[in-house]
Amino acid sequence: MPEQLTNVITLARHADAAPFRRLVEEHGSPLLVLDCDAMRRKYRELRAALPTVGLFYAIKSLPHPDALATLAAEGASFDVATSGELDLLRGIGVDAAATIHTHPIKRERDIRDALDFGCKIFVVDNIDELAKFEAFGAQARLLLRVSFRGKGVVSDLSRKFGCEPGAVPWLLTDAARIGVPVIGLSFHVGSQWPDPAAHVAAV
């Protein structure tokens, strides 16, 4: 038996392996199988658990058009970071009002592409990024990303992204000076954190 088929059998009970074997025979291995029904169920579970929270799917985690279309049909919003990701959303007809741009470093072209698409909300965490929005004024709305250092997190993104809390007043003052509205704060507690209380502590 070919090695890739042996690997498939180790991932599922023998009785359930037949469809995976056929997929590997047809498409080769390694192979990512996307179950849109499972995505739909998980999204609904999360929405039911957090009924008052807007849920934004980070496209970079799995930028497959079928995944995006499945979530869009469920009413999900989207976290975009590149013009290419905006093109994916444009291709499936996503409402631009359901998007937020979170890339920490943006070129003027990136900002313009997002605004042309209709994405109005951006995340910034330093004075240099803030200055890039002076040319766009009130066309854009900003969230200030604050550094939140959590103990025990596997991937601590606040080591390199986010301003110190003490810098927030300075950034607010400068945003007001250049006429760009700040509508809130943003933070990332990190990934692969087994304790849900970490999110509570961050809030």
Located regions from the model:
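Active-site loop/helix belt of alpha/beta enzymes
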Residues: F148-V203
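A charged N-terminal "starter" segment
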Residues: M1-A135, Q139, L172-T173, R177-V182, ...
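ATP-grasp fold ATP-binding core
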Residues: R141-S147
